[in-house]
Design a protein with these regions (language model features):
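N-terminal intrinsically disordered, cationic/polar leader segments
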Residues: 3-54, 61-65, 102-140
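Short, local alpha-helical segments
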Residues: 65-67, 83
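Glycine-rich phosphate/pyrophosphate-binding loops
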Residues: 90-107
Length: 140
C-alpha cells in the first residue's frame, strides 16, 4: 500500500470517532499494535531528541524498503509513533522523503496535543525522514 493510501485510511478511521477522548483511546490501542523495538536497540542513539517522553526508533533496510520498530514509555506517544510507523514502514526511502504529512492536520492531531507533545510529533517525523535520507544515500 502506498503512503497516501495509508494516510487516507487513517483519516477515515479517525473520522469514525465523535470526540477526542475516543480518538485518544484509539491511539492508545494503536500503540498496543506497534512493532516493538528489540531491547538491544533501546539505546541513547535511538532515542528521538525533542520528545518529552522517551521514544526509541530503529530502522533497517529490507529489500530496498525501510522497516521501523519503536517503543515509548508513554501510552499516547506510543500511539503517535505507531501511526507514523504505520505510514512509513515498508516504504522505499525516496517515498518517505517525498511524503507530506498533511493527514496529521486532517485528523486534527497537532491541535489536540500539548505544545511539548506537538514538538515531539515534529521530531518523530523529522527522525523517520532522516533515516530515509541516510538509507537513500546508501542505495545511490
Amino acid at each position: 500500500m502506498k503512503i497516501k493510501e495509508i494516510q487516507t485510511e487513517i483519516v477515515d478511521e479517525f473520522s469514525m470517532f465523535e470526540d477526542w477522548m475516543q480518538r485518544y483511546e484509539f491511539m492508545i490501542d494503536l500503540g498496543k499494535t506497534l512493532p516493538l523495538i528489540d531491547e538491544q536497540f533501546k539505546t541513547d542513539d535511538n532515542i528521538i531528541k525533542g520528545c518529552q517522553s522517551k521514544v526509541w526508533v530503529h530502522a533497517e533496510l529490507v529489500e530496498d524498503k525501510l522497516v521501523f520498530t519503536a517503543d515509548s514509555d508513554a501510552i499516547i506517544t506510543k500511539g503517535i509513533i505507531a501511526i507514523l510507523i504505520r505510514v512509513f514502514s515498508n516504504q522505499k526511502p525516496a517515498a518517505i522523503i517525498e511524503a507530506n504529512t498533511d493527514f496529521i492536520d486532517e485528523i486534527g492531531l497537532k491541535e489536540h496535543l500539548s505544545p511539548t507533545r506537538a514538538n515531539g510529533l515534529v521530531s518523530m517525523i523529522k527522525q523517520l525522514k532522516l533515516y530515509a535520507v541516510a538509507y537513500q544515500t546508501q542505495l545511490n
